[in-house]
């Protein structure tokens, strides 16, 4: 029974729960790695060995947080749970493939951990650039294991993407058009398209790196007519869409949360929101070289990538102001989920503004590989993606479990986390402007003050993570059952009660067509 339900599952709700638990576990590993980084940087001087081990920790932190925390929770967890419920489908289009997508992740995770355990580990950064990732600078199996780990995670995501695209296009009730599906469903579909188009390019790049390392090919070795810059183009053609993959489902969740707790029946500017997400998805593919302003591209190439990158701010602005317009005039309920959503809007906007700064190629020459970049992407990830995950979690927790979280603890948790992440990452803007470079385990004494404050902030965030574990335990132990959920007519996922039955929509939903 247990094995059939949890190992051979074909139920989107159970698989979503598995993704959630896996993501939470990986999130703790990733948090532990980030604490190691901040402990090392809390004071000048060495704490944990040399720069190689430091860079192994940094690399593992990035991979774990991206591939095993944010993506499994947002796409695998929330996506699996909510998409079928929101479109009235009995399950995903390919339920067994759905199970395989999940079970490819634990082996992938184990391969990544194994890469740190053998030889000196993969201290390449998450970009895995050759020649540092070649078999001279990284002899041994570490980088090879990392490549295999990425292959598995990539296959998992591609299969998941095929599944979501098919489900969303094909499994809606006949009366519903694509433009009547909720924004979270749209965000997952656009994310899936991005995954489907970008991951094969990453797979090609790391496969060539694998053959360069082991079969004496020279794709990225000038000695044999190759070029390391080719690898950078291949990697970032995946890497830039990837950062939009990480944030787009968050956009969808924030739209739902803001609408719900503003007491509105629909978000402001639904069509604008959809087109903005599609624009972001499209533009995300034609800006990749803004990660490469320092490699010596032509001035006209840099001018193009600067302009194209800045254009992404327009659809992003459409989304931010539509969220604010949704809030406007609403009967606002200051629930924990709403606090996360408001925190998201504010902090994501700050992260977006530093992104506009970095898009200027001439400025980026100075700021590239400094802590300014670290501050920028942690504002959009550690306070964008993570705040969206937390907001979605406290909002839909009653749906997933049937129990309610303690409201007071949840608000305290938000406050601690808000203070912690800002104390961690705001000072890093100053460090970057002062020229402190990334990926070094030590630094000149002049940078001590802000690093110490940043490290103290990371421990405040750690406190928040521990408090969240307590909150979940408290909710599951107290068993406060959900009495009623308001606004179910415009929030289809709540219609079956909390938690919904194992099987939903086994008979097709009846849709009344509204004449507009």
Curated annotation (Swiss-Prot):
Heme a3 binds at residue 376. It catalyses: 4 Fe(II)-[cytochrome c] + O2 + 8 H(+)(in) = 4 Fe(III)-[cytochrome c] + 2 H2O + 4 H(+)(out). It comes from the Eukaryota. Na(+) binds at residues 40, 45, 441. Keywords: Calcium, Copper, Electron transport, Heme, Iron, Magnesium, Membrane, Metal-binding, Mitochondrion, Mitochondrion inner membrane, Respiratory chain, Sodium, Translocase, Transmembrane, Transmembrane helix, Transport. There is a cross-link at residues 240-244 (1'-histidyl-3'-tyrosine (His-Tyr)). Mg(2+) binds at residues 368-369. O2 binds at residue 244. It is a multi-pass membrane protein. The keyword Magnesium applies. The chain crosses the membrane at residues 12-40, 51-86, 95-117, 141-170, 183-212, 228-261, 270-286, 299-327, 336-357, 371-400, 407-433, 447-478. Residues 1-11, 87-94, 171-182, 262-269, 328-335, 401-406, 479-516 are mitochondrial matrix. Binds 2 heme A groups non-covalently per subunit. Binds a copper B center. Fe(II)-heme a binds at residues 61, 378. Pathway: Energy metabolism; oxidative phosphorylation. Disulfide bonds: none annotated. Component of the cytochrome c oxidase, the last enzyme in the mitochondrial electron transport chain which drives oxidative phosphorylation. The respiratory chain contains 3 multisubunit complexes succinate dehydrogenase (complex II, CII), ubiquinol-cytochrome c oxidoreductase (cytochrome b-c1 complex, complex III, CIII) and cytochrome c oxidase (complex IV, CIV), that cooperate to transfer electrons derived from NADH and succinate to molecular oxygen, creating an electrochemical gradient over the inner membrane that drives transmembrane transport and the ATP synthase. Component of the cytochrome c oxidase (complex IV, CIV), a multisubunit enzyme composed of 14 subunits. The complex is composed of a catalytic core of 3 subunits MT-CO1, MT-CO2 and MT-CO3, encoded in the mitochondrial DNA, and 11 supernumerary subunits COX4I, COX5A, COX5B, COX6A, COX6B, COX6C, COX7A, COX7B, COX7C, COX8 and NDUFA4, which are encoded in the nuclear genome. This is Cytochrome c oxidase subunit 1. The gene is MT-CO1.
